């Protein structure tokens, strides 16, 4: 199945709009990502979000005064994004693919977010194109924030219920390198592979952070419970330690942050 068709088929049947609200790990992912967005761009500026989904980040940033251009590939998500953006004159929602940003000039945005496209780009040429295009349209000195899935967390979260053999075969080759292949809806990375994607690109690495930590794995337990007070305490702990390298691979979602080199 072609990538765009596969993505549209998935999101036609999956309600993305409340994903970051309906679970503790989703709430933590959102809070952590917004924390780093504000660290990179504390004052409202121009933001490009690629793979904007239904607008959870784009709408929030527009309400804070940022000038947001939100690009989404999936038709159902784009429909919901436009509904959620009604009344926000500083948010423009467009359909498009992160691998081709030819509609935008070089150095157009203060901050560029890719908080979803790299989950679905199994082809190396597409991954390289998405990163290069994001860097191109970001101004010199601006930040690019890219979300990735940990291949190890994919295994931990989905393949420890009597289906380990399937998880290993689907996500790793015989030498335990992460697999990326056609018809793979979600593709994961290990840390060295993820970081190597930026080798030779005109950026300076800033940090790599775990955005939801072990909460997705923990929340899968039947006896999991976390009150609002406990969540606030855990979130404070998480933000203090989420950049520590030994905690990265167990997080389902990872956030790579880099700064575009000055010309």
Predicted feature descriptions by range:
Residues 185-202, 208:
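Short alpha-helix
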Residues 56-100:
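Class I SAM-dependent methyltransferase SAM/SAH-binding core
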Residues 102-112:
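A short acidic, Gly/Pro-enriched loop at the edge of an enzyme's catalytic core
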Residues 201, 209-263:
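C-terminal lobe and adjacent flexible extensions of AdoMet/dcAdoMet transferase-like proteins
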Residues 1-51, 56, 60, 144-172:
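Conserved class I S-adenosyl-L-methionine
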Residues 128-140:
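A short glycine-rich, Lys/Arg-flanked "PGG" loop and its adjoining helix->strand segment in the class I
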